[in-house]
Amino acid sequence: MILYKREEYLKRIRGFYHDTEIIKVITGVRRCGKSSLMLTIKEELLNNGINEENCIFIDLDSRKYNTIKTDKDLEKLLDSYDNIKGIKYVFIDEIQNIQNFEEVINAFRIDGEYSIFITGSNSYLLSGELATKLTGRYIEFEIFTLSFYEYIEMKKFYKKTIDTNIISELNNYIIEGGFPKTIQYDSIIDKRTYTRAVVEEIFEKDIKKRVKVRTIETFN
């Protein structure tokens, strides 16, 4: 699938693509498009002449990598790429799935042959633990759900029908919450079902784990 380029964010990150001294940390709520943004960065590197073997995408939610659970597992995996010549561009999706990942990531940063990009849930990466353990050698790029402008442009990109009444489109945008995947669905029922599922996931996995909720019925 051809990816829509979220240029607003890409232009902020491009200057750091080849920087091996800085870890690029992409944060944002669940399903806001962090993984797709990293895939877009990888695509741009390949289009600019970087070899495929030098672009290493590790999705820790995928079957291929779901056995990688600890810092030692991650270290062993990254060590397996040592024989690749030149800078290794490493993309790690959902980094919070790895226990004590910070020291390993920092060690490979110090080696100087790795340009590292990581994504993860706000509930962990914005907790202050990241800043402490990565010793300030990172830059955070916070990603949001689609702006209304992006929402319209993305619908154009994927050749989706756009209502001639801009207010109607704005209402659709508000209902869908700006989550990129809703654009794939044609049925408003499917869009609402997906959005509700995402919001419930954010509440259960992020909000409830980090803060004490006194009036749960407010979220129902």
Task: Enumerate the predicted regions with their spans.
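N-terminal pre-Walker A segment at the start of P-loop NTPase domains
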Residues: 1-16
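Interdomain hinge/linker elements that couple catalytic modules in large macromolecular machines
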Residues: 3, 149-220
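Hydrophobic anchor at the beta1->P-loop junction of P-loop NTPases
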Residues: 26
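Hydrophobic positions on the alpha1 helix immediately C-terminal to the Walker A/P-loop
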Residues: 37, 41
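Short glycine-rich substrate-engagement loop in P-loop NTPases that contacts/grips substrate
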Residues: 56-85
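Structural recognition of the conserved hydrophobic beta-strand(s) that form the central parallel beta-sheet
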Residues: 115-121, 142, 151
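Short regulatory helix/loop adjacent to the ATP-binding pocket of P-loop NTPases
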Residues: 124-140, 155-156
